[in-house]
């Protein structure tokens, strides 16, 4: 039941996110292609680090202020991955992370103002905020996740790989999923309160008061000491996602060294000092290891990206033509049935054209990109898919008309892809 609830809530979060910012997310994966030359692939770090080295995932919860300085003692003994909202706090304490990580397309620029950030190894989802990459100009950019067929093929052609890393909707969860993918057998969490510890929401935030508003409903959960603590519904979903990750990976030791915040089942509670003393013993030149991974698209990278953008543009232009043709045949079929023109041969040919179109669209390398950019059209179609008519002819008419509407929605929506491609070409 716990697993089912996690899947359901994760799906709800993904769906709501796509409806709100799906187009923005999809277009970011195009804009960010200009950062591919000389980047690294996160997949190249899989099973790369020594087995005794733990990963420390640093989030921005209020308890981070308790132990952030201790991260200096873990330098060279653990891989420190700092989530974007914790970067300024961590680096203000003189801690140089091994990696920072960012995911969200709309992450605010104020999270990336730390001095020296450009020198830190910068983990980015393919759909990360383009404005952040433009502002920070990371010297060591590492793309770690994509669901884009184009990106995956490009990394494969370059002798590496790149797939989707996702665990439930927060940057810290992505960082944990990445640590699992990289093969770490011990994951230490700090700043992962997921609750209003000490009447605060974030490590660098102000105290909450009666006028504080939240972007989701609130509820109470047990903290690590057994007391009730206030949290938010989305935080509660993240708590369950962490529990689910730990439950599904019994061979990995999940340590909650937050020293406060919500209780997370299937994790071990200890202080960060205890975790460092017990599990961060051997010293390695971590920076040298990270730097040793080769850069990708270092030779003629800009030209390669331009070629890929041109291919994508041609594919989208063909899609627009074919989607409009699909809408026309759907309208034709609906018209025939509405006027009682039951020509089975003509309808059979129309259905075959629709089948071929749907299969071609599903096989497009850009399919997932298109679904994001046209998420509203897809959502509108899916919300009516089960509103069936009792009469079979009326039901067929409904399906044809809804399909035509979807095809037109896709054809109209992908015009933004072409605009973004053209803008990206200018900026290379």
Pin down the residues of each PLM region.
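Short, small-residue-biased leader/transition segments that mark boundaries at the very start
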Residues: 3-7
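A short, charged/proline- and glycine-enriched loop
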Residues: 48-56
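Glycine-rich phosphate/ribose-binding loops and adjacent secondary-structure elements
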Residues: 64-79, 83-146, 150-151, 164-165
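Glycine-rich phosphate/pyrophosphate-binding loops
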Residues: 86-87, 94-104, 179-205
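Acidic, Ser/Thr-rich peripheral helices and adjacent loops at domain boundaries
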Residues: 101-107, 114-119, 204-220, 274-283
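Active-site/ligand-binding-proximal alpha/beta "capping" segment
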Residues: 131-194
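Polyanion-binding loop/helix "lid" in catalytic or ligand-binding cores
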Residues: 169, 214-262
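Long, compositionally biased charged/polar accessory segments in the mid-to-C-terminal portions
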Residues: 248-428
């Amino acid at each position: 039941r716990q697993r089912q609830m996690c899947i359901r809530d994760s799906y709800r979060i993904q769906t709501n996110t796509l409806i709100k910012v799906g187009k923005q997310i999809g277009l970011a994966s195009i804009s960010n292609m200009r950062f591919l030359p000389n980047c690294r692939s996160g997949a190249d770090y899989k099973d790369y680090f020594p087995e005794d080295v733990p990963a420390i995932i640093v989030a921005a919860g209020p308890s981070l202020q308790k132990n952030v300085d201790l991260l200096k003692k873990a330098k060279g003994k653990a891989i420190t991955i700092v989530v974007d909202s914790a970067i300024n706090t961590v680096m203000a304490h003189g801690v140089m992370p091994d990696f920072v990580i960012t995911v969200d397309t709309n992450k605010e620029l104020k999270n990336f103002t730390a001095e020296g950030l450009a020198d830190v190894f910068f983990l980015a989802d393919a759909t990360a905020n383009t404005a952040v990459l433009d502002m920070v100009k990371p010297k060591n950019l590492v793309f770690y996740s994509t669901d884009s067929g184009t990106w995956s093929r490009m990394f494969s052609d370059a002798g590496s790989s790149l797939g989707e890393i996702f665990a439930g909707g927060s940057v810290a969860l992505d960082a944990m999923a990445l640590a699992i993918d990289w093969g770490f057998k011990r994951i230490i969490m700090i700043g992962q309160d997921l609750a209003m510890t000490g009447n605060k929401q974030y490590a660098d935030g102000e105290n909450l008061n009666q006028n504080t508003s939240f972007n989701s409903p609130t509820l109470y959960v047990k903290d690590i000491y057994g007391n009730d603590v206030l949290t938010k519904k989305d935080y509660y979903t993240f708590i369950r996602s962490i529990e689910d990750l730990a439950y599904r990976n019994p061979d990995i030791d999940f340590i909650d060294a937050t020293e406060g915040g919500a209780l997370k089942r299937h994790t071990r509670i200890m202080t960060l000092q205890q975790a460092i003393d017990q599990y961060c013993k051997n010293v390695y030149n971590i920076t040298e290891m990270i730097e040793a991974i080769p850069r990708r698209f270092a030779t003629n990278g800009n030209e390669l990206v331009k070629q890929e953008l041109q291919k994508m543009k041609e594919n989208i232009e063909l899609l627009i033509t074919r989607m409009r043709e699909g809408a026309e045949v759907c309208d034709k079929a609906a018209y025939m049935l509405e006027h009682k023109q039951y020509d089975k041969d003509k309808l059979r040919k129309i259905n075959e054209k629709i089948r071929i179109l749907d299969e071609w669209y599903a096989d497009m390398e850009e399919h997932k990109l298109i679904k994001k950019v046209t998420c509203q059209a897809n959502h509108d179609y899916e919300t009516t898919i089960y509103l069936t008519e009792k009469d079979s002819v009326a039901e067929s008419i409904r399906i044809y008309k809804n399909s035509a509407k979807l095809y037109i929605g896709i054809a109209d929506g992908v015009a933004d892809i072409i605009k973004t491609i053209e803008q990206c070409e200018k900026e290379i």
